[in-house]
Amino acid sequence: MKNIVIAGASRSGKSTLARMLNEKYGHYVLSIDKLVAVFGSSYPSLDIRLNWNRDKTTENIAPFLGHFMGMFSSPDGKGLQGYSHGEIPGNRFILEGAYIDPAKIAEIVGSYGIDDMREHFNLIGLVQKDKDVETLYRDFRQYDTENDWTYKLSDDELRAVAEDLAAYNREMYTKLTANGFTVYDTSHDREKVFDEIIRSVS
């Protein structure tokens, strides 16, 4: 079975799907949000931080993600270095998050002899393309819990987040479809969509 990449905008169901796939297939789940938090704490000069500048964080973490994916997915683990790092059969991961630049990552992964990422990864995109700003705003108010960073935002602040998220869903749909991801809309019947995805991974 291939490694799995789940990319998409916030609140599209990436973490939930990753947990479901982990339960079924046993892949280790790597949260890009958590990786970003680690970089932000360990190497602040790299400007890889949560809740800061989404575009810059995505740009700055792309080299790490590309080399990580290439090193842990190439048949011999070689890549830019001229020696093998070995392979552990059955050692599989799920990488999930929003800070993904698919074009830049594909370019780096190519240096590991992976010309088409779809041959080595299940590339899954999740968006909520059918939800407008008002629907996203209502979803925040209805489903947020105290653990969500949006929970205590004012109405105006939350509406601004919903406006940004609606635009980001459209942006991610375009980027992901252009770079080989199979994109699923989780605006409606999310459980059915997840069941379809789980059946499709190989």
What are these regions (language model features)?
Residues 6:
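Hydrophobic anchor at the beta1->P-loop junction of P-loop NTPases
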Residues 13:
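Conserved glycine(s) of the Walker
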Residues 17, 21:
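Hydrophobic positions on the alpha1 helix immediately C-terminal to the Walker A/P-loop
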